């Protein structure tokens, strides 16, 4: 039945929006106000697979009542979240009330209120476990709690068999065009190097187009007290970076380029460094299973007071490949070559193992003789 801009469908109906595709019954929707309801709904909201007793359809958000969420496509998910109510702003954030976090049929923890950013998908609501030669076995968990419309408190908790408890805490304000973050605690980079921020204030201006050009730019500003095992310094870091849209040289060949300028200042020794950066890479897909790539990274001055997040090689040539044996196993190799000193800096060997809705990554750095592996939820 229809009346003006409204529809009522008692039988099964499919609601499709740019970021939503759900099927349910007893659907009522008003095209004028872009509001409606649906019972026994199931489908996709953003990248979340959802099931709900009923769902409210609103112009800027969707509200699930007695809902379940997961990214696992299995009929019986390996992990999921259930909640009395979930409010999802697609591409922005979600807030779940009386949330329970399940692995298979076991509740591993619960939260009265839980928030997750959907802008960056690098933070999982489920624990990550792993091992590294430097820190031993570890378990990490990221948690976030809303304090206002755009403000949240967060805790990034990690326990390591060698390094022990390494927590970090803070607050983040996510606005439309930028993020403001205050962080305090222990942070680790991809080379297992630690720093303590006491505290750090960070401004991230999100990617924006440069006029009508095929170029985007970002800006990051950092000010805070950094401490390692031997020194402390009030650290300042400002970087403006431009990224060219990928250039498709052919259906299987893609060129990427980016450049920027960074200024780093330290109170410890009064240093101030200005550095030009340039990065480019060429990716070739030979088949659905095999691809190769080569890259070049240039940093004008890579001398820094702290090793944390520092650039290891000023003039670096990279080349490598990935090969997918089957849907479960992929291997990768790449080499970092120091052009300035004419030497191999490092060889990286990686094995990716698909564990259904989880992924294991095992990496060995041959020159440093360092091993690390982790298991985390698969990013679908």
Question: Residue ranges of each PLM-predicted region?
Answer:
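Transmembrane beta-strand segments of outer-membrane beta-barrel domains in Gram-negative
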Residues: 181-275, 279, 283
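Surface-exposed beta-strand edges and flanking loops
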Residues: 2, 40, 173, 184, ...
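Residue-level marker of positions within ordered structural domains that often coincide
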Residues: 60, 90-91, 176, 208, ...
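Short loop/turn motifs that connect adjacent beta-strands in outer-membrane beta-barrel proteins
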Residues: 147-151, 174-179, 208-217, 245-255, ...
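Outer-membrane beta-barrel "beta-signal"
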Residues: 349-359, 363-380
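Structural signature for solvent-exposed beta-strand/loop edge elements and short helix-capping sites
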Residues: 1-177, 181-195, 202, 227-236, ...
């Amino acid at each position: 039945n229809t009346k003006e801009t409204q529809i009522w469908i008692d039988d099964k109906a499919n609601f499709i929006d740019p970021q939503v595709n759900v099927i349910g019954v007893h659907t009522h929707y008003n095209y004028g106000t872009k509001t409606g309801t649906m019972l026994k709904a199931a489908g996709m909201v953003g990248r979340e697979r959802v099931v709900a007793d009923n769902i409210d359809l609103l112009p800027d958000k969707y509200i699930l009542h007695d809902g379940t969420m997961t990214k696992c496509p299995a009929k019986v998910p390996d992990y999921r979240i259930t909640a009395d109510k979930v409010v999802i702003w697609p591409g922005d954030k979600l807030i779940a009330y009386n949330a329970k976090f399940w692995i298979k049929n076991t509740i591993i923890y619960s939260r009265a209120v839980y928030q997750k950013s959907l802008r960056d998908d690098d933070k999982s609501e489920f624990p990550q476990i792993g091992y590294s030669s430097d820190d031993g076995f570890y378990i990490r968990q990221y948690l976030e709690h809303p304090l206002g419309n755009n403000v949240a408190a967060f805790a990034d908790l990690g326990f390591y068999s060698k390094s022990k408890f390494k927590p970090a805490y803070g607050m983040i304000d996510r606005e439309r065009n930028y993020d403001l973050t205050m962080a305090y605690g222990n942070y680790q980079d991809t080379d297992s190097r630690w720093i303590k921020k006491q505290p750090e204030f960070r401004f991230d201006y999100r990617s924006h187009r440069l006029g009508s050009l095929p170029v985007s730019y970002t800006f990051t500003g950092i000010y805070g007290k950094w401490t390692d095992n031997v020194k402390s310094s009030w650290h300042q870091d400002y970087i403006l970076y431009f990224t060219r849209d990928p250039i498709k040289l052919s259906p299987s060949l893609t060129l990427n380029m980016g450049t920027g300028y960074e200024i780093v200042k330290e109170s410890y020794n009064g240093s101030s460094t200005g550095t030009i950066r340039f990065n480019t890479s060429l990716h070739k897909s030979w088949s659905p299973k095999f691809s190769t790539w080569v890259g070049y990274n240039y940093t004008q001055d890579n001398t820094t007071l702290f090793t944390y997040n520092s650039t290891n090689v000023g003039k670096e040539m990279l080349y490598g490949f990935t090969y997918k044996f089957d849907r479960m196993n992929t291997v990768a190799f790449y080499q970092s070559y120091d052009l300035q000193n004419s030497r191999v800096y490092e060889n990286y060997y990686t094995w990716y193992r698909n564990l259904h809705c989880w992924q294991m990554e095992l990496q060995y750095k041959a020159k440093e003789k360092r091993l690390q592996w982790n298991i985390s939820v698969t990013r679908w």
